[in-house]
């Protein structure tokens, strides 16, 4: 079987959020994958595709793996969106400067969708979030995912008001 050329992992940073969008490793490429995660200070991986590797080595390195698979080319379920936004809010509040890695098979569809949702919830417009991610991850998103993101209405879960009732420009307080 021919080896697929996979895009390099890309870091997406917005306000106080840091994400690493990447493709899935295999057991054969796991050590290199772990090195890459450590280089970016990743403490949590969200795996949104079927498992292609054993998580034992990753967990031994202190990196928590969450399995939230959803169908390739499709938008995430409401439950996955809720879980994702809760994770983002908690991680960046409790571990400032940390990085959350997200991967699907190629890192072009499902993983970028979750990162785009976090950017939108953080105050970025849908079009800007798509362009911002595509500048770093060419080919990200298919037409069904773009339509989902266009219709997505932020719940303002990653924006807060200060004690005076003013919107705080900081994403998470």
Curated annotation (Swiss-Prot):
One of its GO terms (cellular component) is cytoplasmic side of plasma membrane. One of its GO terms (biological process) is positive regulation of cell migration. SMART domains: PTPc_motif. SUPFAM superfamilies: (Phosphotyrosine protein) phosphatases II. A lipid is attached at residue 170 (S-farnesyl cysteine). It catalyses: O-phospho-L-tyrosyl-[protein] + H2O = L-tyrosyl-[protein] + phosphate. InterPro entries: Prot-tyrosine_phosphatase-like, PTP, Tyr_Pase_cat, Tyr_Pase_dom, TYR_PHOSPHATASE_DUAL_dom. Residues 8-161 form the Tyrosine-protein phosphatase domain. Pfam families: Tc-R-P. Belongs to the protein-tyrosine phosphatase family. This is Protein tyrosine phosphatase type IVA 1. It comes from Homo sapiens (Human). The gene is PTP4A1.
